[in-house]
Curated annotation (Swiss-Prot):
Entry binding sites for Ca(2+): D48, D49, C86, D295, N296
Localisation: Lysosome; Cell surface
Pathological association: Defects in Arsb are the cause of mucopolysaccharidosis type VI (MPS-VI).
UniProt EC number: 3.1.6.12
Family matches, as InterPro entries: Alkaline_phosphatase_core_sf, ARSB, Sulfatase_CS, Sulfatase_N
Protein name listed in UniProt: Arylsulfatase B
A single MF term (Gene Ontology): N-acetylgalactosamine-4-sulfatase activity
Cofactor: record remark: Binds 1 Ca(2+) ion per subunit.
Reactions mediated catalytically: Hydrolysis of the 4-sulfate groups of the N-acetyl-D-galactosamine 4-sulfate units of chondroitin sulfate and dermatan sulfate
S-S bridge residues: C112-C516, C116-C150, C176-C187, C400-C442
Residues reported to bind substrate: K140, H237, K313
Length: 528
């Protein structure tokens, strides 16, 4: 038989010659969408007021076996930052943007304030919904509710079950807040299923209610559709309440607040274990990314602890903003490791949207970075800097023990620091450096009540001091201010603070509106 027309090299019909290019073509042909790996399910568990020293994998005496096991098989985030209070952390989680860019840099959203995360911000659930996800939220909102347009079901969540305000009773599900015209406080129900009051859960502990709703959502979820579940537990925010049996293992803790708190953490740990079990039972776990994070540091006045870190909830010290967290997933390329790469709560939005195959188109400029390769593969973090906050109107709602007020603000500042007014409450991280200005909040160290007779170790800083520089890698406990040894670092970071300050929007902190009064309905609800 003669050679095939157009062939070279002596290849004959039926021989290997023509098949090799065909094989290469098939190998190089783009995979069909149906052949690609399906987008992962995402479960984001946010604990409330959980301290650095309140988890077993950080060396706490509190027993957290389920969280410890997930952390041990995943990636522990050891250089991860959140905000000092709940609204700031939650808003930055869902927008991927610093609070100075939304007018939320001052304190938090109060119950009767006509305020919420700006409605022109596109939130994480909206972006994931655009990517084909089912989006569900269970638990604490605290991002404003004065208008129905501010509610979770109007901001991208298919379903919502939880409470809208900052804290409430774990059993009655009532929240109390001041009503200015009454010169007193009003208490009312704050629990909703969708947008309707949920009145049938009295005397049922909130962590159990939220866990039941989360596991039901998982059990009923079609595995072929990607799931986003945002589970924002009430635990372990005050009031200090927990079923008695969860306190019994902690009889050795003499401090009553710490003992109740420990029981609350144990119940939270059990809840996360039940959620994980539900994911496995439904066959979702092998394609799930589970993220666990606190929203801010522990509140030492309510049993929490951040030892050996300095400070507590409400402060820019490490005890207020160093986030306890981890990522657990069979999809991780590295497991059982601790990441020292710099990360921030704003990073979750771009990370999860990109992981979902979605797009951040339509958002305002993001401050977060996609850190999935950092978490999953151990790559260097794309983040080298993060803004902690800038709040010219800061007041200390949680003063140091024995102190009743915020130290008086000194508006004069040395000329050598003229790049930024150092009397302003602000903070910034750059690589290993951390700069604080103004009054960062109570700078005491608080040893664990169960391990020491000393309730706090006061700072020796002058009350008029308004500038600190720390090498956090060498000094995570913030005991050695090195600002005098590194004036050029100070100047550079002050210049960065000034840049952020100039590009911030004015803080929006409207006065309380007495029309919020729930007297007529007995339920906290939108009023405008």
């Amino acid at each position: 038989m003669g050679e095939l027309s157009g062939c070279t090299g002596g290849s004959r019909a039926g021989g290997p010659g023509p098949r090799l290019p065909l094989l290469l073509l098939l190998l190089l042909w783009p995979a069909r969408a149906s052949d690609a790996a399906p987008p992962p399910h995402v479960v984001f568990v946010l604990a409330d007021d959980l301290g650095w020293n309140d988890l077993g994998f950080h060396g706490s005496v509190i027993r957290t076996p389920h969280l410890d096991a997930l952390a041990a098989g995943g990636v522990v985030l050891d250089n991860y930052y959140v905000q000092p209070l709940c609204t700031p952390s939650r808003s930055q989680l869902l927008t991927g943007r610093y609070q100075i860019h939304m007018g939320l840099q001052h304190y938090l959203i109060m119950t009767c304030q006509p305020n919420c995360v700006p409605l022109d911000e596109k939130l994480l659930p909206q972006l994931l919904k655009d990517a084909g996800y089912a989006t569900h939220m269970v638990g604490k909102w605290h991002l404003g509710m004065y208008r129905k347009e501010c509610l979770p079901t109007r901001r991208g969540f298919d379903t919502y079950f939880g409470y809208l305000l900052g804290s409430e009773d774990y059993y009655t599900h009532e929240a109390c807040a001041p009503i200015e015209c009454l010169n007193g406080t009003r208490c009312a129900l704050d629990l909703r299923d969708g947008e309707e009051p949920a009145k049938e859960y009295t005397d049922i502990y909130s962590t159990n209610i939220f866990t039941k709703r989360a596991t039901t959502l998982i059990a009923n979820h079609p595995p072929e559709k990607p799931l986003f579940l945002y589970l924002a537990f009430q635990s372990v925010h005050d009031p200090l309440q927990v079923p008695e049996e969860y306190m019994e293992p902690y009889d050795f803790i003499q401090d009553k607040h710490r003992r109740i708190y420990a029981g609350m953490v144990s119940l939270l740990d059990e809840a996360v274990g039940n959620v994980t079990k539900a994911l496995k039972s439904r066959g979702l776990w092998n394609n799930t990314v589970l993220i666990f994070s606190t929203d801010n540091g522990g509140q030492t006045r309510s049993g929490g602890n951040n030892w050996p870190l300095r400070g507590r909830k409400g402060t820019l010290w490490e005890g207020g903003i160093r986030g306890a967290g981890f990522v657990a997933s069979p999809l991780l390329k590295q497991k059982g490791v601790k990441s020292r790469e710099l990360m921030h709560i704003t990073d979750w939005l771009p990370t999860l949207v990109n992981l979902a195959g979605g797009s951040t188109h339509g958002t305002k400029p993001l401050d977060g970075f996609d850190v999935w390769e950092t978490i999953s593969e151990g790559s260097p973090s794309p983040r080298v800097e993060l803004l902690l906050n800038i709040d010219p109107d800061f007041f200390d709602g949680l003063p140091c023990p024995g102190k009743n007020t915020t130290p008086e603000k000194n508006d004069s500042f040395p000329l050598e620091h003229s790049a930024f007014n150092t009397s302003i409450h602000a903070g910034i991280r750059y690589k290993n450096w951390k700069l604080l200005t103004g009054y960062p909040g109570c700078g005491y160290w608080f040893p664990p009540p169960s391990q020491s007779n000393i309730s706090e170790v006061p700072s020796v800083d002058s009350p008029t001091k308004t500038l600190w520089l720390f090498d956090i890698n060498r000094d995570p406990e913030e005991r050695h201010d090195v600002s005098r040894e590194h004036p050029h670092i100070v100047q550079n970071l002050l210049s960065r603070l000034q840049y952020y300050h100039e590009h911030s929007v004015p803080s929006y902190f409207p006065p309380l509106d007495p029309r919020c009064d729930p007297k007529g309905t007995g339920v906290w609800s939108p009023w405008m």
